[in-house]
Amino acid sequence: KITSKFGPRRRRMHNGIDVKVYIGDTIRSAFSGKVRVVKNQGRRVGYGKYVIIRHENGLETVYAHLSKQLVKEDQYVEAGEVIGLGGNTGRSTGSHLHFETRFLGQAINPALLFDFEKQDIVADSYLFMKGKNRYRRNNSSYASANGDVQYYKVRKGDSLSRISQKT
């Protein structure tokens, strides 16, 4: 169950979502990847105990407020592998998992990538462009929230320069 959504919150931006978990619940990696950060910001400060994983496609996922981290930095983890236990560490008002997704340092609303009720991904592939987030489900056409999708069929003799001028 989502207890707090992505977006502006009081005086600052909430760059992830909060998922209800109980202390000691198993937390698993969303995708395969390399553990980049395993840290503890301390009691009542920031994320508390947290893990950041960089996935092969460049996406990073953040798992915060853990009671225990079960991975080490530079460790490779598979999708679904246990990485920690749910908790209430750091700046937290109850047990929950703070979950963030980032691409090239930019926070992305996890609800655009995951359907938390169905426990599935939203799309089979994603295309991230400056100012635009697009996704594709089951090889259908790309969808965009602002409807500005453009297509271009590459023809013999086309160069990247020519294509960029036409799109």
Can you annotate each of these PLM segments?
Residues 1, 111, 121-144, 156:
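Non-catalytic extracellular/periplasmic "stalk"
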Residues 2, 27, 33-35, 74-86:
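A structural signal for short beta-strand/turn segments enriched in small hydrophobics and glycine
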Residues 3-29:
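Short glycine/threonine/proline-enriched tight-turn/helix- or strand-capping micro-motif at secondary-structure
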Residues 10, 134-167:
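Primarily a LysM-type cell-wall glycan-binding module
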Residues 21, 30, 71-72, 77, ...:
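Surface-exposed strand-loop junctions at beta-sheet edges and helix termini
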Residues 29-73, 95-100:
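Zn2+-dependent peptidoglycan hydrolase active-site motif and core
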Residues 38-40, 82, 87-88, 165:
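Short, surface-exposed secondary-structure boundary micro-motifs
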Residues 46-54, 75-131:
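Conserved, short, structured surface segments that act as functional micro-motifs
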